[in-house]
Amino acid sequence: MAKVAMIVPKEKMLTLAKPMLDSYSNMHVVLLECVEPEDSQLALKIAQDALAQGCELIIARGVQATLIKHHTSVPVVEIQLTAQEVGGELLSMKEQLGLDCPKIGLVALSNMVGDISRLNELFPVELREYYTDDRDTLSSAVDQALADGCQGIIGGHAACKRAQELGLAYHFLPDSSESLRNAMAIASRVCYAMDLK
């Protein structure tokens, strides 16, 4: 059974993940840690320590997943938001704004969101996507969303902080069980393949 480490950026994700772990018999989670997004170097150190102790796969999100991928040789399964999770936030933002078809910007790191290409067809909103590979450019992505006429944004901590400074409506990226479940299912399949070697 492959040894897995899971590093998540929020306590809520840790709480959601714990009861799901027993559902995946192909993987043995040896480390489950919460590391704040601003402390990505700590996430990298934890990942390197886990590797030294025999960890064979890491589950992570956002900038932490990117750092671990670039600075270790371990396979990384990324936790990505699903269309359903983003759709729920779009409807909530639409209700908050009280507009028939608001223009909403999704501001996130490019590896944090799965395929949402058809959400504009499914929801009465105009969704604009602002993805970046660098956490330091999230604030300027919010500035661009405002310049493009977005009436609200959905984003992480840095993006929402900038939206608040600009007086722009905002919602935080959701932390729900669906994206965690998807990542664990992928990790479980990878672990199964590792076990067959």
Name the predicted role of every residue range.
Residues M1-K197:
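Non-catalytic structural scaffold of enzyme domains
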